[in-house]
Structure formats: C-alpha cells, structure tokens
Amino acid sequence: VRGGGHSWPGLSVADGGLMIDLALQNSVTVDPARQRASAQGGALLGHLDSATLPQGLVTTAGVVSHTGVGGFTLGGGFGRLNRKFGLAVDNLVAADIVTADGQFRTVSAEQEPDLFWALRGGGGNFGVATRFEFQLHPFDRNVLSGMIVWPVEQAREVLDFYAGWYTGLSDDLYVGPVMLTMPDGTSVIAMEVV
C-alpha cells in the first residue's frame, strides 16, 4: 500500500507485486469543536498541518511534510510534539480499514476494539487503512528552533550530559541528538532544540 510514498525506493513494493496507491485520496477535514481531524489514506503530513494549524490545533506529526499520514501513524509516529501529546498512534481515535476478506470496517476503542488495538501497534498488517481520525490539541504559540553543534570528538560528553539533563525537561521542549556530516566532510554531533 502506498500512502505518501516516503519509504526508501523499492523497499515497499515486491518485485512482481501489486501496489495499492492511495495518493489521490488525500483530503483532510477538521472539526474544531470536537478537536478532531480526519485524514484520508493518501494524505501527507503537510496536508494535515495545513488543515489544522489555521484552527490553532495540532497533533503529533513528523518533521518531513511529504511523509504519508498512514505510514507515519501505523509506524508509531514519532515527532517533535510527542513529549507533550504522545506519539501519532496515541492520538489516533478511529480508522477506516478494508480487511483481507474485503470488509470495510471502522475501528475505534468502542467499535472493534481488538482490531483497533492491533492497528495501533501492528502497523499495516491488518488491512488497508483508508482514513485516520486524530485527536487534536490547542496550540496557539510561536515555535523557535535551532541546532547546537559540537565536534564529533565531543559526542560522548554531549550525550552523557543529554542523558542526565533530558529527563527533567518540560514536555513543552523537544531536544534531539543528531549525528551529521557537514558539507566539508567533517562529522559533528548536534542537538536539535524546538
């Protein structure tokens, strides 16, 4: 199943296999009163953000706007807001799927809870997800981000500091270590701060 097509080329499709492409099913609707968003199986994270942000609402999303909502969510969904709001899968409140027997099912904690539980932890192994419904959260502030960079030789010292310091941070702050190779070929360790 191709949602956003963000996977490494060739890793998601078997030679001679069949691909179900959901790219044209990419609409997102927002219900501000219920603080819910509904995204079709081919929607991208950029579509989701574009629909929710003008309403002052967010859910956990990734850092690359052309990632598919489906693959991101069914893979757990780690993003910069996960400390505050949980993983994307934690914010999934319902999904529409077509199972291998051809049945269309809407699953949630109240409706087919076992299948919903499996979907939230087992990825796309239980059917083709055609719609995702997310809990949204008010978010009306400006965000500032940047990177702090050190030579890679200081990686152990930086990571030791990070490990002891990170657990006491506010859930409003995202800090993530990244190893990078700079354009001149030098390696660095960086902390992304949002």
Please state what every model-predicted region is.
Residues 7-9, 46-47, 67-69, 136-137, ...:
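Flexible loop/turn segments at secondary-structure boundaries
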Residues 17, 34-38, 186-190:
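A generic structural signal for beta-strand entry/edge sites
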Residues 95-96, 100-194:
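C-terminal cap/substrate-recognition region of VAO/PCMH-type FAD-linked oxidoreductases
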